[in-house]
Amino acid sequence: WDWIYQPYLASHPEFAEIISYLRELYSQADFHIQAEPVCVPGKVDLAAPPIARATRACRQERTAVRQQLGLREEQQAILVTMGGIAGTELPLAKMRSCENFCFVLPGQGGKEMKVDGNLFFLPSDCAVRHPDLIAACDAVIGKVGYSTLAEVYQAGIPFAYISREWFRESRPLADFIDREMPSLPLTEEAFLQQDLSDMLTRLCQLPRRERGKESGASMVAAFLQGLLSF
């Protein structure tokens, strides 16, 4: 976070105290773990893949989640997550016109799930965990943020990502997505204003990437367990 806050110093000098405090705090650590994507590579005790909450993404669980949502197995489902981009209203009319696709919209419903044609509005406290929603879908549209990136990476499904260039960490995250994930870059303007059909067709044609059984979370857990066994 000290690195992330640095660009704000010119307009907000008060960040200097926060940056100094964080650097001092970090320097007291006995061990250093970095998880991909890494913005500032350094000497570490463990380098790990992206860390996401575990998913119950076996075939049976994926089918069960889709059945719970009311999605048929043959339907192409796109999860849309736009948290963190203030004031963004989803282009629902454009989504409705993409009749060959269904759109899963977490946090966009009221207290209960609502289905409107090919739009599936889910409440914020949806009973299905977010990693399992992603694993049950065929692709994701979303802004570039660590948790979304890590969960899509874990699922291995295509990602149409919207980079927030005004955030310092966005470029390293986008570079990682381009290199390690089936993906298409997408501007916020294109998402909100342009026809989505062609982009979605190209997105869903990208091959999935199978991930190994050892996740970033399991690697870190094993490392910490090793420390506790001393």
PLM feature segments, named:
Residues 128-129, 148, 195, 219:
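Short acidic active-site motifs
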Residues 26, 39-48, 93-97, 109-119, ...:
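Short loop/helix-cap segments at secondary-structure boundaries that form the rim of catalytic
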Residues 197-230:
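C-terminal amphipathic helix plus adjacent low-complexity
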Residues 1-87:
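A nucleotide-sugar donor-handling region in carbohydrate enzymes
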Residues 53-56, 60-139, 189-190:
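Donor-nucleotide binding loops and adjacent catalytic segments primarily
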Residues 129-172:
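A donor-sugar binding/catalytic signature common to diverse glycosyltransferases
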Residues 123-124, 154, 158-202:
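Nucleotide-sugar donor-binding patch of glycosyltransferase catalytic domains
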Residues 1-6, 111-112, 167-170:
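Short gly/pro/ser/thr-enriched loop/turn and capping motifs at secondary-structure boundaries
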